[in-house]
């Protein structure tokens, strides 16, 4: 620029995951550019502009005539620009590509698609510098590989600059009552709001994170209702993804202008949208991973040398232990590992279509370009050719279901290219990896009784019962975005809160398990309360109240039963009300792992014992329940490292989980088009078509590439089959023993699982009362045990 040699071309592409972030970046570039011009002593004429799906046709034409030197965009828009002939020419001089919030892209299919686009861009223009900006993430080396990709099977060079150690953290775990177990639910509720109000009033601006959208709305409503002098419509607002873009933008602007005392959010403010200065971040209950905790708390003191201040409010003993270990890991820099999806065949199909639009490709060369992406470095030739075969319409049966060829293949010349004049339009209007979603209507006897979320519907299979509006219903069948139910009695098989829960990370779960093992050792070696309390103070960063609550929790579990840990899987046989029996697996591995384990066990039980099984899962374990005999342990022991994945895969057939995942994959791979000739297809129509296609494909070829991807996504992304397999291996090689116990009252560690699942029909007050009654009964049992042992 100083030499006056800037051409009308793009030199730098800045990619962020959110359109709102793009707009922030453009504004925030103004000052640095002015500073550069001031140093240079002249107007350098460096242009910047945002290009997203919201950019008008007029603005796009303007960019073609005079393109920005710094182009700010999203992953999806970059993919479209790579196949736009006129604008593609403007990218020929790109020297830098900057990816903001790379951690939020790397862990999902948007990142997978972006990694292919980066290789496509390199194919077009040659070498360029890639820069990734990330919040706290681990392992940095893997994210670096994701950023730069591979060359001839060897990872490209990447310099890593880690500045996390420069950030000063002030994090504490707080409890709203002096004794979590003895306080009733109303005391805990009032204590939570009083504590939260105190924290907000002590600071200028506070950001509060709940883990659900419903929780966000509830906290805003109750703060205004309970403290009308402190909160009103002018100084407190909610921010979550279900609110309109206009409402979210108004909240962000008010925050920047310092007009808000507090904002309550679910997850929508985790990424680095510019919201001005935040003094304090409060997390209501566990954020379920160290990286998420640090990301949220990092919104306070957002500048490099400023302290980040966070408080985590816990409301039960499981949360207290979980957050105390999380706090230890955060302070000691131990971050959960990121999971980057591999070999996603639906995204590959979409990208191959995009490549074909540019010009014909040599099949071997295209394979080499694709495998330069970190996400496809291990892509097999068979999978690649299967996707090409599908895209070329070689499954002739699919034409019966209106799935037509998108590309042609010339095997003699070993090339492929686009088919049809509408290719660019179809690609541009159907690009992307985020599936359309909508509320699912629940109908009973022809009457609509409410809505559930689609990811909740995924859990349902015929005969499952759940609670909606205080009533229990039995799931009969689903059709499109409507499900048919019947009134039901008895406990629900699927807890109604399931769909909005954040899953506990496997790494944090295993650290909690290790703490459990340490505590178990102290008790077994006869250490005194004082010695164990000293260990808790030394090991965790907690105050007197918290340390004592943790001690009491563990001493009750140890005295009444056994302490499960990373060395011991405890299986508890508990007889519930009536003839109902429970097999409780104390498997603290996180909900995604427990989802996989419980499905596999339930599948064996249902197949071998012909029993209608109820499942309830949490981060801390799962239970199977049925009337009469239940072979839960016997079924679990049949799982081996060799058969586990196959059994879990079989359990997915005829489930809503597979149907929903297939619908998403069919959309990404362009089997179903979300938009065609200007018409958008409703989610309901997509759902119906997805189910018809799934059944057709299963009969046509059970190893069809997109069906194969739907299974992979369900197993690896929706559940966590790989870490579940690690658990099976730990047991198989003797590193984790299985111990069983029989109880007339659930053990303390099982209280929350039993009350949240089996008693989902109860309100929070009744659940708390039930838990207190169980706790009292356990203490009576412990007294009897102590008398018998003369301790």
Where in the sequence are the language-model features?
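Loop/turn positions that initiate beta-strands
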Residues: 463, 468-469
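Short beta-strand-centered aromatic/proline hotspots
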Residues: 471-478
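A contiguous, basic/glycine-rich beta-loop/short-helix subdomain that forms a polymer-engagement track
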Residues: 139-142, 151-152, 179-190, 405-457, ...
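Short, solvent-exposed secondary-structure boundary/capping segments
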Residues: 416, 479-496
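Extended, highly charged accessory segments
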Residues: 367-370, 374-439, 452-453, 495-497, ...
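Surface loops and adjacent helix of pleckstrin homology
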Residues: 174, 211, 454, 478, ...
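Helicase motor core with emphasis on the C-terminal RecA-like subdomain
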Residues: 1-414
């Amino acid at each position: 620029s100083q030499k006056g040699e800037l051409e009308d071309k793009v030199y730098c592409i800045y990619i962020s995951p959110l359109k709102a972030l793009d707009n922030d970046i453009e504004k925030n570039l103004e000052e640095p550019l002015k500073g550069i011009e001031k140093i240079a002593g002249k107007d350098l004429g460096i242009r910047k502009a945002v290009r997203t799906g919201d950019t008008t046709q007029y603005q796009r034409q303007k960019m073609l005539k005079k393109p920005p030197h710094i182009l700010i965009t999203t992953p999806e828009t970059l993919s479209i620009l790579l196949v736009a002939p006129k604008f593609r020419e403007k990218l020929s001089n790109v020297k830098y590509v900057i990816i903001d919030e790379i951690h939020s892209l790397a862990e999902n299919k948007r990142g997978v698609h972006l990694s292919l686009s980066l290789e496509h861009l390199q194919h077009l223009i040659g070498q360029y510098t890639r820069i990734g900006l990330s919040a706290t993430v681990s392992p940095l080396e893997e994210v670096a590989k994701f950023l730069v990709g591979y060359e001839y099977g060897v990872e490209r060079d990447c310099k890593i600059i880690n500045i996390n150690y420069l950030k000063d953290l002030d994090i504490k775990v707080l409890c709203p009552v002096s004794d979590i177990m003895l306080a009733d639910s109303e005391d805990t509720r009032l204590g939570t709001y009083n504590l939260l109000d105190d924290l907000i009033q002590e600071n200028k601006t506070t950001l509060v994170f709940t883990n659900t959208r419903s929780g966000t709305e509830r906290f805003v409503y109750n703060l205004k209702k309970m403290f009308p002098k402190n909160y009103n419509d002018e100084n407190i607002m909610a921010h979550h993804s279900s609110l309109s873009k206009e409402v979210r933008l108004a909240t962000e602007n008010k925050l920047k202008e310092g007009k808000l005392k507090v904002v309550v959010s679910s997850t929508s403010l985790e990424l680095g949208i510019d919201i001005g200065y935040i003094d304090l971040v409060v997390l209501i209950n566990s954020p379920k991973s160290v990286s998420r905790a640090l990301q949220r708390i990092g919104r306070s003191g957002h500048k490099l040398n400023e302290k980040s201040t966070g408080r985590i409010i816990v409301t039960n003993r499981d949360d207290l232990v979980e957050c105390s270990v999380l706090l230890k890991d955060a302070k000691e820099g131990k971050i959960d590992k990121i999971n980057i999806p591999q070999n996603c065949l639906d995204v590959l199909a979409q990208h191959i279509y995009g490549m074909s639009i540019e010009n014909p490709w040599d099949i071997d060369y295209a394979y080499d370009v694709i495998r330069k992406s970190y996400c496809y470095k291990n892509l097999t030739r068979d999978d690649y050719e299967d996707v090409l075969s599908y895209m070329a319409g070689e499954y002739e049966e699919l034409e019966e279901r209106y799935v037509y060829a998108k590309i042609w293949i010339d095997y003699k010349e070993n090339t492929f290219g686009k088919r049809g004049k509408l290719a660019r339009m179809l690609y541009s209007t159907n690009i992307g990896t985020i599936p359309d979603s909508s509320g699912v209507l629940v109908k009973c006897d022809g009457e609509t009784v409410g809505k559930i979320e689609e990811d909740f519907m995924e859990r349902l299979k015929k005969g499952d019962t759940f609670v909606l509006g205080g009533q229990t219903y039995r799931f009969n069948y689903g059709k499109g975005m409507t499900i048919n139910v019947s009134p039901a009695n008895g406990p629900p098989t699927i807890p109604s809160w399931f769909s909005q829960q954040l899953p506990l990370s496997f790494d944090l779960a295993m650290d909690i398990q290790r703490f459990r093992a340490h505590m178990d050792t102290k008790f077994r070696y006869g250490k005194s309360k004082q010695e164990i309390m000293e260990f808790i103070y030394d090991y965790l960063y907690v105050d007197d109240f918290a340390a004592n609550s943790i001690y009491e929790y563990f001493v009750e579990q140890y005295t009444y039963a056994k302490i499960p840990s990373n060395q011991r899987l405890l299986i508890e046989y508990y007889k519930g009300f009536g003839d109902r029996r429970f097999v409780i697996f104390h498997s603290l591995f996180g909900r995604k792992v427990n989802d996989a384990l419980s499905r596999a066990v339930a599948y064996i039980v249902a197949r071998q014992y012909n029993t209608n099984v109820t499942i309830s899962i949490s981060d801390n374990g799962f239970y199977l329940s049925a009337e009469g005999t239940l072979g839960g342990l016997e079924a679990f022991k049949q799982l081996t490292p060799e058969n586990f994945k196959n059994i879990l895969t079989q359990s997915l057939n005829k489930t809503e989980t597979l149907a929903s995942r297939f619908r998403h994959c069919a959309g990404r791979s362009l089997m179903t088009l979300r938009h065609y000739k200007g018409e958008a297809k409703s989610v309901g129509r997509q759902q119906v078509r997805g189910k018809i296609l799934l059944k057709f494909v299963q009969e046509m070829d059970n190893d069809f590439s997109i069906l194969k991807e739907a299974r992979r996504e369900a197993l690896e992304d929706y559940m966590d089959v790989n870490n579940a397999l690690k658990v099976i291996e730990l047991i198989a090689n003797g590193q984790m023993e299985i111990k069983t116990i029989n109880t007339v009252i659930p053990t303390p560690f099982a209280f929350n699982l039993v009350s949240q699942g089996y008693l989902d029909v109860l309100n929070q007050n009744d659940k708390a009362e039930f838990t207190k009654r169980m706790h009292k009964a356990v203490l009576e049992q412990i007294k009897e045990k102590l008398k018998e042992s003369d301790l």
